Amino acid sequence: MQRDEAPFSADHQKLWRMDESSIWCLKNGRREENPAISVMRTLWDQPRWLEAHYLYDDRGSELFEKICQLPEYYLTRTEESILERTAADIIAAAPVECIVELGAGSAKKTTHLLAAQIEQRKNGIFAPIDVSLPGLILSREFNRRHLPQIRFHGLHARYEEGFASIDKNLSTLFVFLGSTLGNFNAASFVRFFSQLSDAMGPNDFLLLGVDRIKDIQVLERAYADSRGLTAEFILNVFAHINRLVESNFDLAKMRYHSWYNREWQQIEMYALSTAAQEIRFPSFGTSFWWEKNDRILVEISRKFDPERLQQQLRFFTLNPVRHFTDPNEWFSLLLFKKAAD
């Protein structure tokens, strides 16, 4: 592969390159459902819920970055400490040409893997996929300054949109960090791994970061911090939705509530209405009543038994290779290899 050639398959014809910047976009634009229809579809469900990606407007992304620095929120620093300690072992176990990060953001944690790739193989390709263009630009600029041996080709898309664009002729390590998998319900879990497995070649690997089942007090503190940043983050979604669809959620009449659901092994994050509100959607001429003390589920964060998860992913032809964890066994990095057909 030539130095300036993108790591995309024939489907790269559906992409366009932004002013020679090594960031690619879908030619026909990202496939987006009308946000009003998307929001109404889930709010008319019983129980009511929202799709978690609405959390990440500019303010939401800023709040989440602050949450990651909180003493109660152990996930980010624990995962990065594992990566820092084991990156060389991961790259040695997964000899690939290309690293594709799904939902990369600024790709800060992945730099440990890229540095190990340079140390062991002198060069390589990094292809982050993310819906955040500013995050991709930050990642590209960091890569240019600190990792010039790595060829950078970012893709501005949702990862499921980007799967089909990755060249199967390249040996690839797919990276999915941050326990983002924990935000998936059962249907999303199956859909994600079905699509990912189809996109992988027989010499490809997956590195998966997941939060583990642990003491309930530790879990609940991580999602109910003393500064109230998580509450602000969750309730901010309604300000975002108000701007998107011209609805009238009143943030002054709601509060945040979270708890650990033992049966489903997940933290559940809700907005609870403190007074009855008529929520209107003027562009559709419809409304619903959000009654006092009724809840809307905004996000879940599932926790995992790593051994059980390894067995589940065999169904998607992903075989376990290595398991890395921290001294407290709070978080796991799981390395899988795609089985040959």
Regions found by a protein language model. Give the residues of each.
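A short glycine-rich, Lys/Arg-flanked "PGG" loop and its adjoining helix->strand segment in the class I
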Residues: V190-P202
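Conserved SAM/SAH-binding beta-strand->alpha-helix loop
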Residues: I129-L133
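N-terminal auxiliary segments of SAM/dcSAM-dependent transferases
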Residues: Q2-Y54, S61
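Conserved beta-strand signature within the Rossmann-like core of class I S-adenosyl-L-methionine
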Residues: A199-I213
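Class I SAM-dependent methyltransferase Rossmann-like catalytic core
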Residues: P47-A94
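Substrate-binding/catalytic lobe of Class I Rossmann-like enzymes that use SAM or dcSAM, i.e.
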Residues: E220-P306, Q310-L318
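Conserved SAM-binding loop of SAM-dependent methyltransferases across substrates and taxa
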Residues: S106-R121
